Curated annotation (Swiss-Prot):
This is Probable bifunctional tRNA threonylcarbamoyladenosine biosynthesis protein. The lineage of its organism: Archaea, Methanobacteriati, Methanobacteriota, Stenosarchaea group, Methanomicrobia. It is an enzyme of class 2 (transferase). One of its GO terms (biological process) is tRNA threonylcarbamoyladenosine modification. The keyword Acyltransferase applies. Transmembrane segments: none annotated. L-threonylcarbamoyladenylate binds at Y134, V135, S136, G137, A138, D166, G179, E183, N262. The keyword Metal-binding applies. In the N-terminal section; belongs to the KAE1 / TsaD family. Fe cation binds at H113, H117, Y134, D290.
């Protein structure tokens, strides 16, 4: 059988890189990196760099391929990064790709840059159906495949982790690229400095962390601040990845993107996966940053599934989202089936037997008054987190949950009754119910909307609205897990709350559009400002990740 040869061009930001691959082999790759004299990336200068070197990069690539017996006439298609990325850079490499496509009379393939990071990781590791932690300059997302698309479970609400690291590095006077310099400085630290730790369900925010870290430089050493920044930011992304694992029941994590080259981040993810019994995969470092091979290989997958472009449809998209792509090259039936827990297992478990191993806590039953079952939620240490971060978070969330779960019940939201509070442990009413992630229907989604409407009317934001945190007991719906909850009546806070739930619908449940509409109906019936909040949800969803 004849090999398929695809030439791919990457040029979304710093790297201009081109490669030729087959189904099993990297034939050649050539890269020219834009390096500004000072500061961060300048889009027009980067585009000028790409324009200057595009011809020579392609020429060198074809020469290397020829040495291995591959001629231009052997090529089957030309793939290029269609987005997301910096507009001027994208337009430059798209022009080069179109010229090659026309001159060789072969198809053009527009590749989503983020998905290319995922596919190169799956190609170069044993991962098959992972939860993907994708952390690069402009993007920070937790992703997994379902129903023909890569779905986003959570993402940054402001700035990507890589850009946040670079921004802090510039303020600290460190040369570009900032990430490796921060990693090197962190190795000489002597203490941890408390910094903001911001997680909103499965979404993240890094802007406050960067600002606080810059302020900390006035009182602490550069080494200590770099160490503290890393420990805090990486703990946040690892926790979100663990939340996705717990919610989906999957047992693989794949690390993708340039920030994934950081050794400490890899260590933390590996520790988390070992504790959960999950497998952790990461490709070679050469495939973590932006590279032509990932574009060529993803282009090959697309080409073989009939996914090519006409010239008229080859416009670039600087805000091209991961979940906008119709993934034609993956067959749903070939993916691993996630085992679903039997609803009866929640009801039959004997005292002391672990019911659930969540991202925050372990859940088990105990004997209560008069022989009744009591649910115990114990926030156990997370070894991947720095001890100071871990103890602070577990203590704060335990107190918050005990207080706000009671406040929510007073506001008319069904929640478990708290019986006893310890430093890292809660004893509460055992609800003989089942998480609605196993049962969700439009009718249930409407009831969820009514519940959240009452919660928001009382000024409480849940902070972790997922279908794992809603229980159905008979005809009654209960809201649980208030560890990330807080009081806030702002449109932004309420919008993020609902956005997290909608992401869960889209990433985990089939027919998510009907679930969203049903929720909106229920939400509007109990919350007077629902229309304003839902409008804000749309704004949050459309926020660009490239600045």
């Amino acid at each position: 059988m004849k090999n398929t040869f695809i030439l791919g061009i990457e040029g979304t930001a710093w790297n201009l890189s081109a490669a030729i691959v087959t189904e099993t082999e990297i034939i050649a790759e050539v890269t020219e990196t834009y390096k500004p004299e000072v500061g961060g990336i300048h889009p027009r200068e980067a585009a000028q760099h790409h324009a200057k070197y595009a011809a020579s990069v392609i020429k060198r690539l074809l020469a290397e391929a020829k040495e291995k017996g591959v001629e231009p006439s052997d090529l089957d298609g030309i793939a290029f990064s269609q987005g997301p990325g910096l507009g001027p850079c994208l337009r430059t490499i798209a022009t080069a790709a179109r010229m090659l496509s026309l001159s060789l009379d072969i198809p053009l393939i527009g590749v989503n840059h983020c998905i290319a990071h995922i596919e190169i990781g799956i190609w170069r590791t044993p991962a098959r159906d992972p939860v993907v932690l994708y952390v690069s300059g402009a993007n920070s997302q937790v992703i997994s495949f379902m129903e023909g698309r890569y779905r986003v479970f959570g993402e940054t609400l402001d700035i990507g982790l890589g850009n946040a690291l670079d921004k802090f590095a510039r303020r600290a006077g460190l040369p570009h690229p900032g990430g490796p310099k921060i990693e090197a400085c962190a190795k000489d630290a002597k203490r941890y400095i408390p910094l903001p730790y911001v997680i909103k369900g499965m979404d993240l925010s890094f802007s406050g962390l960067s600002t606080a870290s810059s302020e900390a430089l006035k009182k602490a050493s550069l080494e200590d601040v770099c160490y503290s920044y890393q420990e805090t930011a990486f703990a946040m992304v690892v926790e979100v990845a663990e939340r996705a694992l717990a919610h989906t029941g999957k047992n693989e994590v794949l690390l993708a993107g340039g920030v994934g080259a950081n050794t400490r981040l890899r260590e933390m993810l590996n520790e988390m996966c070992e504790a959960r019994g999950a497998k952790f995969y990461v490709p070679e470092k050469r495939f973590m940053g932006d590279n032509g091979t990932m574009i060529a290989y993803t282009g090959l997958l697309m080409y073989k599934s009939g996914n090519t472009l006409t010239l008229e449809d080859s416009r670039v998209n600087p805000n091209f989202r991961t979940d906008d792509v119709n993934v034609t090259w993956i067959k749903e039936e070939e993916m691993k089936k996630v085992p679903e827990i039997s609803p009866e297992a929640f009801l039959r478990a004997p005292p002391g037997e672990r019911l659930d191993n969540g991202a925050e806590a372990v859940i088990y039953l105990d004997e209560g008054p008069e022989g009744k079952k009591v649910l115990v939620k114990e926030r156990v240490p997370k070894l991947y987190r720095h001890k100071e971060i871990d103890e602070r978070i577990r203590r704060e969330r335990n107190r918050t949950e005990a207080r706000l779960i009671s406040e929510a019940r007073r506001a008319g939201v069904p929640t478990p009754i708290i019986y006893d509070i310890e430093e890292f442990k809660l004893k509460m009413q055992f609800i003989e119910g089942v998480p609605i992630k196993y049962l969700i229907t439009p009718e249930l989604s409407e009831k969820v909307g009514e519940l959240v409407g009452r919660l928001h009317s009382s000024g409480i934001v849940h902070g972790d609205l997922t279908t794992s945190n809603l229980l159905l007991a008979g005809e009654r719906l209960y809201l649980i897990d208030f560890g990330l909850a807080y009081f806030d009546k702002s449109l932004e806070a309420r919008g993020v709350d609902v956005h997290v739930l909608f992401q869960t619908f889209e990433s985990t449940h089939r027919g998510h559009e009907t679930l969203v509409k049903a929720f909106e109906k229920g939400y509007g019936s109990t919350f007077i400002d629902s229309k304003d909040v839902l409008k804000r949800v749309e704004e949050i969803k459309k926020r660009a990740r490239y600045a």
